[in-house]
Amino acid sequence: MAKKNIHPQWYEEAKFYCNGEIVKIIGSTRMEINADIWSGNHPFYIGTQKIVDTEGRIDKFIRKYNLNSENSESL
């Protein structure tokens, strides 16, 4: 037999807040959900993401260990 009264209460009209504004009305086990960032204002999802990595990992490795074409041939 299934146990009674073990599941959390489900709220059909829970309010989802982002930066103090109601963004969505969703179903949740909490009455209110607060978030700093969500898909509606995240740079990746709205297309304003900038690539931060300006140099490649291989170039960084070579520079870090002072490897150049002359040194790599002797290895």
UniProtKB/Swiss-Prot annotation:
Subunit structure, as described in the record = Part of the 50S ribosomal subunit.
Give a short account of what the protein does: Binds the 23S rRNA.
UniProt-listed GO biological process terms = translation
Q: Gene of origin?
A: rpl31
Highest rank taxon of the organism: Eukaryota
Stretches assigned to coiled coil: none
- Annotated signal sequence range: none
Q: Which organism is it from?
A: Cyanidium caldarium
Keywords on record: Chloroplast, Plastid, Ribonucleoprotein, Ribosomal protein, RNA-binding, rRNA-binding
Report the GO terms under cellular component.
Answer: chloroplast; ribonucleoprotein complex; ribosome
List, in alphabetical order, the Gene Ontology terms for molecular function in this entry.
Answer: rRNA binding; structural constituent of ribosome
Q: What is this protein called?
A: Large ribosomal subunit protein bL31c
Disulfide feature: none
Q: Where in the cell is it found?
A: Plastid, Chloroplast
> InterPro entries recorded for this chain?
Ribosomal_bL28/bL31-like_sf, Ribosomal_bL31, Ribosomal_bL31_A, Ribosomal_bL31_sf
Mainly resides where?
plastid
